[in-house]
């Protein structure tokens, strides 16, 4: 297996649901970070990019018909570059990076772009076809998040718990208290607010320019953060699934919009295209768990990856764990033997504060882990996340 390097990485700001990026189509949004990779890398012969891999979880609206291909064309990349859209739900963007890594490591490719996009604000309502000409049981499905067009066999065999219900299942099964969840959520908000104030995220963000009748709006900051959050305010929120449960809007991730893109290259491509390697991709691994506790999915994925690499979780200087819910984040950390407030975990906050645009988030985790390693001087970084329907994904990098 050959070395594979991440040579550049950029993302858009993360928009709040119905917020600043709500007017931007998913394909246009995906084109923003792709286009932003071109100017800083003038020596790259772009027509020699082997593939653009892009993750996207929905694909029911404007992100249909292979958004990766449409976005690369909209970004002005050569028509000769093929593009493919991957869907591993929440981990789609990370899977795109891992897929590019494997193709280059095997020798099949030399140069690729990988990333992800999601516009949850613009997720459409959809309706299936009638089973008869006079059917009256038509159902309109909201594609923003969660189940749709449920298979009766899936429901009877595994259940079709909503995402908040799976988070409460994890809280119950792994004994994660409401107090611990709220404290975890508060730390996420505080760390993200501090990082934003210090300009940490500005270095990984490309502004999104939105034209309108009165001129132009420039979106350049993540807008989901709530720096005014207090523990008192979090404790007052009502549980989503009933009074005896613990998951709330405050200790869960957001519904958001965003896109990210990274350049991956072999050692030969680095030299040929004048690229600067920033990190080496060490590997990626996935794991499966019961769908009702999908949030614990990172545990088998991380264990598989660390065993394969011959390292321990404690060897990672940065761990970017997607905060789908505080309950699952805490359960994962405890199962992996990591302290609730370990300084190497999400040092700049996580999805509870920053938001969780599904197809983008996995790429954002890898990008932010790389950025933090460069800032801190650390060597190894781990990005991991749970996945709907009971999966986990983990990817490791090493700064060079």
Swiss-Prot record:
InterPro entries found in the cross-reference section: PcaF (IPR012793), Thiolase (IPR002155), Thiolase-like (IPR016039), Thiolase_acyl_enz_int_AS (IPR020615), Thiolase_AS (IPR020610), Thiolase_C (IPR020617), Thiolase_CS (IPR020613), Thiolase_N (IPR020616)
Domain of life: Bacteria
Gene Ontology annotations of biological process type: 3,4-dihydroxybenzoate catabolic process; beta-ketoadipate pathway
Example of a GO MF term: 3-oxoadipyl-CoA thiolase activity
PROSITE patterns for the chain: THIOLASE_1, THIOLASE_2, THIOLASE_3
Function: Catalyzes thiolytic cleavage of beta-ketoadipyl-CoA to succinyl-CoA and acetyl-CoA.
Protein name, entry field: Beta-ketoadipyl-CoA thiolase
Gene assigned in the entry: pcaF
